[in-house]
Amino acid sequence: DKIEVQTVAYEMKEDQIGYIAVSEFDSVTYHQFETALEDLEKQGMKGLVIDLRNNPGGNFDTVTDMLKLLLPEGVIVSTKDKEGNVEEVTCDGANEFDKPLAVLVNQYSASASEIFSGAVQDYGIGEIVGMTTYGKGVVQQLMDLGDGTCLKMTIAEYYTPNGRSINGKGVEPDVEVE
């Protein structure tokens, strides 16, 4: 039997504000997030808080797929390798989120959390609340060396929809709260 890790917890708070906490971006996270969003919508959600505090990141495809449930049409994130080759991940805008949105972050929100909060901030569809994020704006790959060890290599840097690099800087909150 496979045990599915719960990476998403959610509830309806007072005043019909939905709350979704995402602990990491795992392969199972997209489906859990989509289910949470749909359930909160059914309950009459008037606004949404997405909590990415202490979320170290995770799967690149998972975070971009989750953002496709929220963002308008356009670029979600782009990556640039050392040769200067740029790849863009785009969104068709079919599910654009049109209610008040806040994304909670702190100094331990990293990598995929920064792709998420950076995109929300660049499109202006929500407020980023908390502390400046970690600043891990690189794509890394593990290379198996065949002897039980592996090498982690940085293969590209990623940029927010407006072309901002997060690496070493992080995403600054719109509203700073400790």
Task: Outline where the language-model segments fall.
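Cleft-lining beta-strand/loop regions that shape enzyme active-site pockets
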Residues: 1-143
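Short hydrophobic-aromatic micro-motifs
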Residues: 18-20, 151-153, 166
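Metal-dependent DNA phosphodiester-chemistry modules and their immediately adjacent helices/loops
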Residues: 111, 161-166
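Contiguous effector/interaction surfaces
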Residues: 116, 159, 172-173
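Short acidic, Pro/Gly- and aromatic-enriched capping/linker segments at domain boundaries
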Residues: 145-147, 151-156
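Conserved functional hotspot residues or short segments at active or partner-binding sites
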Residues: 165-168, 172-178
